[in-house]
């Protein structure tokens, strides 16, 4: 994990096109031809490339996923996806095994990452999964990339990370909020609302997504009359609720994390729950949190794949999670994306013949299909056989097509639209 201290970071440029109403794709143009990685050189971000490794590879992988904090409900499905991928890869016998060290990202209030990231780096990991929260990822990304370690998030959606100077070491399997904001803004307008308010988490995820919703909704002829913000760790939201309600909105968008559990009771005592809109940071099962019917009819969006289309994978992920002594998964959000992140890292290591972060980073775009000429494959074992046979793999997994561009962003994405039923459980209605 050698780092060149005075190296120039990647210069990034935001390039987004082709947003559509339910499923959103960003096409980065013609894919470039594959290039050979020369051992002994450096990456464009200034990390030293190690030599190819002989024999079977062992990848040391860590995670900084939300086991605590305001996104803790995403911790179980993400860890479940990671463990299943590790087990599948280790059982495949394709020339690589993974040593997995899980960790807690926490949030920007409890700052669990301040102890976990040093622990993982000291353990010698070459890649870290996480965080789920974009704002949390931004708190430790510099520490990770300074060591030429890959940071790979299954759930970060902030557009700020597209242009972040990450030395070419940051990747994600969730699409940018440019896509979710477009879909959500169009959905609200399609539902007939003309004047909306928002309550917004004051971080890169919250304010960024709020802006993209605003852009989409106003382009459709709507008006955003208020968008009060709050900070992570706040516990009283009376002022934000009052500001959101003051202009008599038709609908209210809640761009929050777990704080929504505190916001909802006070808000729906003054505003119909059916006219609320949720986002990926808070779209989850509230059957044991609120009275039946409290959220019936409310809608929300999140990047993901329809569970009905990956039923076998969902069952395997849940069964594997339960077999490890955990309770059955209540939500599945970002589990498939985490699984695919682990598989892509393993495939990149095989292609690079190295488990060093710098070397893997140079092959992740290729194994995702972002470099022209690959053979499509859908499991780790299938793709590994292609690579081990001298071919070029193009992996698509349970989260769907990935296809990294040169910035480490996926160029395809699907946005689900869900609606709460009478039990306050979100059910997919489109996407």
Q: Model regions: which residues?
A:
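Extracytosolic ligand-binding ectodomains
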Residues: 2-23, 27-431
């Amino acid at each position: 994990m050698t780092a060149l201290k005075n190296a120039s970071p990647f210069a990034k440029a935001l390039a987004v096109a082709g947003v559509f109403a339910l499923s959103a794709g960003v096409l980065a143009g013609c894919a470039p031809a594959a290039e050979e990685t020369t051992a002994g050189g450096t990456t464009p971000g200034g990390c030293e490339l190690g030599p190819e490794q002989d024999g079977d590879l062992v990848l040391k992988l860590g995670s900084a996923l939300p086991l605590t904090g305001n996104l803790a409900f995403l911790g179980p499905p993400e860890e479940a996806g990671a463990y299943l991928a590790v087990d599948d890869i280790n059982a495949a016998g394709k020339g690589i095994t993974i040593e997995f060290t899980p960790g807690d990202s926490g949030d920007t209030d409890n700052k669990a990452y301040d102890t976990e990231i040093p622990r993982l780096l000291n353990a010698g990991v070459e890649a870290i999964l996480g965080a789920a929260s974009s704002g949390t990822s931004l708190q430790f990304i510099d520490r990770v990339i300074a060591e030429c370690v890959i940071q790979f998030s299954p759930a970060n959606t902030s557009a700020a990370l597209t242009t972040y100077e990450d030395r070419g070491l940051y990747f994600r399997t969730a699409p940018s909020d440019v896509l979710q904001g477009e879909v959500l803004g169009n959905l609200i307008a399609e539902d007939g609302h003309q004047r909306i308010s928002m309550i917004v988490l004051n971080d890169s995820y919250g304010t960024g997504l709020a802006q993209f919703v605003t852009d989409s909704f106003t382009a459709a002829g709507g008006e955003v009359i208020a968008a009060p913000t709050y900070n992570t760790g706040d516990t009283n939201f009376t002022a934000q609720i009052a500001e959101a309600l003051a202009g008599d909105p038709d609908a209210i968008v809640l761009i929050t994390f777990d704080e929504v559990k505190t916001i909802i009771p006070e808000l729906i005592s003054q505003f119909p729950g059916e006219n609320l809109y949720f986002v990926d940071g808070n779209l989850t099962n509230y059957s044991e949190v609120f009275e039946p019917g409290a959220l019936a009819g409310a809608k929300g969006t999140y990047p993901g794949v329809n569970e009905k289309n990956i039923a076998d994978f969902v069952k395997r992920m849940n069964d594997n999670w339960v077999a490890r002594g955990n309770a059955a998964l209540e939500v599945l959000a970002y589990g498939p994306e985490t699984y695919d992140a682990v598989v892509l890292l393993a495939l990149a290591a095989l292609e690079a013949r190295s488990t060093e972060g710098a070397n893997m980073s140079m092959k992740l775009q290729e194994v995702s299909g972002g470099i022209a000429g690959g053979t499509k494959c859908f499991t780790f074992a299938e793709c590994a056989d292609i690579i081990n046979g001298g071919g070029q793999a193009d992996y698509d997994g349970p989260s769907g097509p990935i296809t990294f561009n040169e910035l480490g962003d996926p160029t395809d994405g699907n946005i689900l639209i869900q609606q709460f039923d009478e039990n306050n459980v979100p059910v997919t209605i489109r996407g």
